[in-house]
Amino acid sequence: MYIGRLRKEGRYSTAHVYENALFSFRGFCGTSTVSFGQITREHLRCYGQYLYERGLKPNTVSTYMRMLRSIYNRGVESGRAPYVHRLFHEVYTGVDVRQKKALPVTELHRLLYEDPKSDHLRRTQAIAALMFQFCGMSFADLAHLEKSSLDRNVIYYNRIKTKTPMSVEVLDTAKDMIYQLRNRQPSLRDCPDYLFGILSGDKKRKDEDAYREYQSALRKFNNQLRGLAKALHLTSPVTSYTIRHSWATTAKYRGVPIEMISESL
């Protein structure tokens, strides 16, 4: 019921995380459904070990545990689950800040500027470079930029996640990449005219279909980033988040105020 309410509110990303957590816990339990009675201290401890044995990172394990805790707490509030003092006390629900996300400087330079000798990887590289040059812009924000967002040498947009209005200067080094990636197809009537051809811009779809299209585009981009990193012989893992955190780390070392970095991220 709670996941259904999240969908009605348009919070598809949050609903997706809850669904993933429940799907994972059902796999551990070996059942098609999960009851509150299956969420016990012993079960949770074994479930945590189960996740680690499958190679999940501490922060992913924590996310799944926090989703289960939230669901259980809602069950307690509604009277459908018994209150158990510190039920989740023995499992990890924190955030491991030691998980490095920024690339070393030499690998970052290779990722963004070394020729991968492949047209489709050059396109991936150009998208990554724009994300970096646009102050660590998220892939979601880049994908949803419309042609009207670009006004002379400035891009104006609202963050997808927070709706915060933002603006970034387009440097000369970014202009060629924008020209290379620019969507030259006319938009359909009453549909967004996206600057880049990452999304289709079909407003006739339901919102959840649009969310699924974005998730598909994100998975594709992350797969392409892995291919780019492999072609350039990088040893560090690379995702869209890597680019954002690499920009933040670079900006910090160059003396950019933390407040400005946090606002961009």
Annotate the PLM regions.
Residues 73-82, 131-152, 259:
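Short, charged phosphate-coordinating catalytic segments
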Residues 116-118, 156-169, 208-217, 235-242:
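Short, contiguous acidic/charged loop-to-helix segments that flank catalytic cores in large enzymes
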Residues 85-139, 143:
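Basic, Lys/Arg- and aromatic-enriched nucleic-acid-binding interface segment
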Residues 1-54:
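Basic/aromatic-enriched alpha-helical hairpins
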